[in-house]
């Protein structure tokens, strides 16, 4: 019997999301206008909390839908105006271009990245050195490329290798159901479990590597570009401004990688089983033997385009998004991708997040119009200039660990910029706060998948169920990194940021810019 129209409407509303989640969103949408009519400031904070809730529940429903409904309602009831939202979007156009074009551009360099990570995995036999290499490679790539793309490539390598061994273990060469272990013998099942542990640890090291590298440069994370634009920094200066915090954090992060592997802590330390290595090596040898000259030339072309990307970013030859567009044009031209649909696939990864970021800017417009963060900023600015840095770092870190760090970084840098424009803080102090905001937004956010988009991408990927990587296990495996990165970052903000920055200014490495 066919269901009623009411039941059909309920099922269509937010699709497969749990009923309690749908009900919660409906309550939000009913309550917000009522509260706004009585107490606009309270309603504004209610909206922010609700929006953070949708980000935290990203596994129940992609936040674009519920967050978008909340943003539309905020516009309809007058919490902000379409004109203000347009201003926010226009002011952050570079970030949208970064997400649209740079991520799509790197998509056409995936063959090269797959080649690099495959060579690492099979070329390094020591698990400690392999983990360090994956972490370092992910960090380096994330400093210039989008972290999501780097993680996507590592996922592709892991799924490919898992599938190769799973088919051998199941004695079914054509089996595509990688989740089904029922027909695998006990011995192979034990080896497969070890292989899962090995892949879990590598994926987590690579994920943390993207955070370590992503915090260092203005293109490493979307919020970095927003912060760099607010402070008037280019690529080189951004790196030097962050270096007093990010370089010690990088060293301590890599030491953590070695320690958890050596002492097999927090689920790390599982080596690659010899039988699996043998199977993978044989497969790779066959693949390399079959590689044509055309495929080799594609890899060389992608490597040269990678060099162009790094040089163009380092010397700020154009806006980041336009450099990404040049990568799309060069990569498609020299790898022979000419079909419109094949090119279109490159944009599917980034556009949902680009749309979500546009919704972020709507919420930011509400925060500005309703002056929601004014009491928080006034409280922080009452402290001494030195204490302000630690407070900004901690406030950012706390919110970024449960919410999306792009949203948090955007809100706080806007508030700091407003304080500068109103004369509440000096220009040198604003620059220090920008460093504290950027590092506070990026480093503690490794605590949960909600904070790091790359972690959330990994958790929702096809690989996660294959290697038994759940939300809880991811938080547990990230814990040593969370503690080390957060504490070392805080200590550096507290003790090394100001003296090292003063030294760089005194020796002409940095200059105080004229703000845009």
UniProtKB/Swiss-Prot annotation:
It holds the Pfam family NhaB. The gene is nhaB. It catalyses: 2 Na(+)(in) + 3 H(+)(out) = 2 Na(+)(out) + 3 H(+)(in). Its main location: membrane. It comes from Klebsiella pneumoniae subsp. pneumoniae (strain ATCC 700721 / MGH 78578). InterPro entries: Na+/H+_antiporter_NhaB. This is Na(+)/H(+) antiporter NhaB. The keyword Transport applies. Keywords: Antiport, Cell inner membrane, Cell membrane, Ion transport, Membrane, Sodium, Sodium transport, Transmembrane, Transmembrane helix, Transport. Na(+)/H(+) antiporter that extrudes sodium in exchange for external protons. It is found in: Cell inner membrane. Signal peptide: none annotated. GO terms for molecular function: sodium:proton antiporter activity. GO terms for cellular component: plasma membrane. PANTHER family: NA(+)_H(+) ANTIPORTER NHAB, TRANSPORTER ARSB-RELATED. Belongs to the NhaB Na(+)/H(+) (TC 2.A.34) antiporter family. The chain crosses the membrane at residues 23-43, 61-80, 97-117, 120-140, 144-164, 202-222, 238-258, 303-323, 348-368, 391-411, 447-467, 475-495. The keyword Transmembrane applies. It is a multi-pass membrane protein.
